[in-house]
């Protein structure tokens, strides 16, 4: 008799458990809401603002959120690379600089920033190439800065002739 009662209790418990599993979502269908395409841009701007104020923890949160919202956004990769560069996390910085220029080779600001990073890492020739890539964009407003950076980096090779060439180009 007890065996029969315990079987009924077990069956009842399993039934209740299964019913609970099927109604856990409240019976409502789950809808996917696509993120606002501008949200990633806004989070990049917020991240840069927090970074300028030295609040790196919140900056990282905002930039990671931007990358979750749009993993293909070059400005998000560039911004988080700058943050990792400041934090001394060179491997992560390089990864995101590469992603940024890969996703938009004409993104001159990222090319220039990547060049600065490479020059700091003593990869002078590669850095100079990034600076020159930055100057190829006719709409880039900081060509003189990129050429000055190329001259500074060429000076560290050391190639005084090449450095002088870039410095003179920067002045024109």
Residue ranges and their predicted role:
Residues 65-66, 99-100, 133-137, 169-170:
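Canonical positions in the second alpha-helix
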Residues 18-38:
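Bacterial Sec signal peptide processing site at the extreme N-terminus
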Residues 76, 110, 117, 144-146:
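TPR alpha-solenoid repeat register
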Residues 39, 46, 73, 107, ...:
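Residue-level recognition of tetratricopeptide repeat
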Residues 52, 86-87, 120-121, 156-157:
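Register position in tetratricopeptide repeats
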Residues 45, 79, 113, 147-149:
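Canonical tetratricopeptide repeat
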Residues 35, 69, 103, 137-139, ...:
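Structural marker of alpha-solenoid helical repeat scaffolds
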